[in-house]
Amino acid sequence: MTVELGFHYDEKVDLLLKSASACAKEKNFDTAISVMKEALENIWISDVSFSPANIAKIIPYFQKAGRYSDGVAFADTYLIPKLIEDYDQSGSTDRAFICLYVGKVHEKLALNAKREKIKDDEMFFSNKAAEMLSAYTKLMEIGRIEDLKEEYQQMLAVFGNDYGKWPDTVLKKFEAILK
């Protein structure tokens, strides 16, 4: 049996992300925005996970292109709705990551507002980013407990109901749900 290890990536998205970065480096921000929009369309259908940085990368391009309001509108009407569209059908851990990604978008919006010296927007987006980070942390803990409860059922089948017969390391792992 051969096991192949390697890094799986989406070549098309990777090339689009690099192209957008190159356009931005040349200060061609409108083209960078167009390329990033295409990259995002491909990210949504890719079987590869992308970092929050890749998802939110488009936001600063709007500000640098002198299109601050367009960036806010793009985030509000497209980017954030796209990120949260599966929220209600997701488990706690997936919901946590949705919150993380939305929080990163808000961080970029806050940075744009800071650069534009729009204090009210900066405060608003910073607060939203903090809310999303808090939700991420809480949902990750809920997801951890849910996973433990699932695994606990398997441990019951292996070790039985008498916790005195369970190994100490296993008991320690399940402390959070045995209380």
Descriptions of predicted regions:
Residues 7-38:
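Alpha-helical segment of the N-proximal tetratricopeptide repeat
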